[in-house]
C-alpha cells in the first residue's frame, strides 16, 4: 500500500457550514465599486451552505434593503442547520440553536 503524508476524512457531514461576516458592495451599472458596508458581526452573520439567506429585497419606495441572516457569531459551525430556539427538532444532528434574523439597511447605511 505504501505510505502517505496526506490525511483524509471520509465521514460525510451534510450539515457542515461556517458563519462569516457580511459585506454589501454598492456598485455602479458599469461595475465600479462605490463603497462597501460591513454588517456588524455582533448583529448577524452569513453561513456558507445556506441557500435561504442574503436574497436582497428593495422596499417599494426604494429607501431600504432587507435580507435574512443568522443571529450567530462569526466562525461558528453548523448554524444554518441548527434548531431555532424554542423549536427543537430531536432528529437534527446539530446540537445548537440560533435565531434567524431579518436585517433592514436604510439608503444612508443605517442598520
Predicted feature descriptions by range:
Residues 1-16, 68-96:
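Short, conserved, GDST-rich strand-edge loop motifs in beta-rich repeat architectures
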Residues 2-42:
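Beta-propeller domains
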Residues 19-23, 42-73, 97-101:
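Signature of short aromatic-glycine-proline-rich micro-motifs recurring in repeat-based ectodomains
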Residues 20-29, 86-108:
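Beta-propeller blade signature
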Residues 32-49, 107-111:
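Surface-exposed loop and turn segments in beta-propeller and other repeat-based domains
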Amino acid at each position: 500500500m505504501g505510505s502517505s503524508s496526506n490525511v483524509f476524512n471520509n465521514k460525510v457531514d451534510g450539515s457542515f457550514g461556517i458563519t462569516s461576516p457580511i459585506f454589501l458592495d454598492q456598485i455602479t451599472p458599469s461595475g465600479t465599486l462605490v463603497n462597501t458596508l460591513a454588517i456588524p458581526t455582533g448583529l448577524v452573520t452569513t453561513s456558507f451552505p445556506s441557500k435561504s439567506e442574503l436574497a436582497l429585497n428593495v422596499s417599494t419606495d426604494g429607501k431600504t434593503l432587507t435580507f435574512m441572516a443568522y443571529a450567530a457569531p462569526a466562525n461558528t459551525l453548523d448554524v444554518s442547520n441548527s434548531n431555532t430556539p424554542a423549536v427543537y427538532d430531536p432528529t437534527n444532528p446539530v446540537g445548537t440553536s440560533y435565531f434567524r434574523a431579518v436585517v433592514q439597511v436604510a439608503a444612508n447605511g443605517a442598520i
